[in-house]
């Protein structure tokens, strides 16, 4: 009986710990998004889609877990549930509010803008150089450019996980034929050029 009680207590403790850890991941994800918004909200190119791509690239290149589950969307790797959660948390904390405009959704600063920074420094100081590089590189880039890099990164990473040999042409084929029809609006040459740029600038996946 004592063993059963002990086991039960352990189960309860584990459940509580798991719940707390999950909540912490969601908060850390919102803190990261707040820093991205803080740095990019004045840029005319920054909105919902670019936020998603910056989160994806940061998660992958900084090797951090923010509880995202991406799927292949028209605009690249996308996690709609996570983005809705982030938008809700940003507004709850009064850091940023998403407003729909003629040019799409914009992140508008609220009265507590900047108060996330203590948390950001706590959670992400170890990856700050890589994070800074991502933000500085894509700060003024248009949404399509961010979409191209994020999409290639995801397709490239998937091929690496397959443990089979592949070429740059295979990466592009994965994007053009196994992703979304809208990807075909971008020329094969442009995809190949972007792969080379990613290698030269340190944005290639390394699994």
Where in this protein do the model-derived segments appear?
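Conserved, aromatic- and glycine-enriched, well-ordered alpha/beta core segments
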Residues: 20-149, 156-207
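Amphipathic alpha-helical coiled-coil/heptad-repeat segments
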Residues: 1-24
């Amino acid at each position: 009986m004592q063993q059963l009680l002990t086991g039960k207590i352990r189960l309860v403790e584990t459940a509580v710990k798991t719940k707390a850890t999950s909540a912490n991941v969601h908060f850390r994800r919102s803190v990261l998004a707040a820093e991205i918004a803080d740095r990019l909200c004045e840029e005319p190119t920054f909105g919902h889609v670019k936020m998603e791509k910056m989160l994806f690239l940061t998660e992958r290149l900084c090797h951090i877990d923010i509880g995202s589950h991406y799927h292949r969307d028209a605009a690249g790797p996308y996690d709609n549930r996570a983005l809705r959660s982030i938008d809700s948390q940003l507004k709850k904390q009064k850091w940023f509010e998403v407003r729909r405009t003629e040019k799409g959704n914009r992140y508008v600063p609220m009265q507590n803008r900047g108060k996330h920074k203590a948390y950001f420094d706590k959670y992400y100081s170890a990856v700050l150089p890589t994070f800074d590089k991502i933000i500085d590189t894509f700060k003024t880039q248009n949404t399509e450019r961010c979409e191209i890099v994020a999409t290639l990164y995801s397709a490239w990473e998937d091929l690496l996980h397959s443990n089979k040999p592949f070429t740059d042409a295979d990466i592009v084929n994965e994007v053009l034929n196994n992703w979304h029809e809208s990807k075909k609006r971008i020329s094969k040459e442009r995809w190949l050029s972007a792969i080379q740029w990613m290698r030269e600038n340190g944005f290639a996946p390394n699994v």
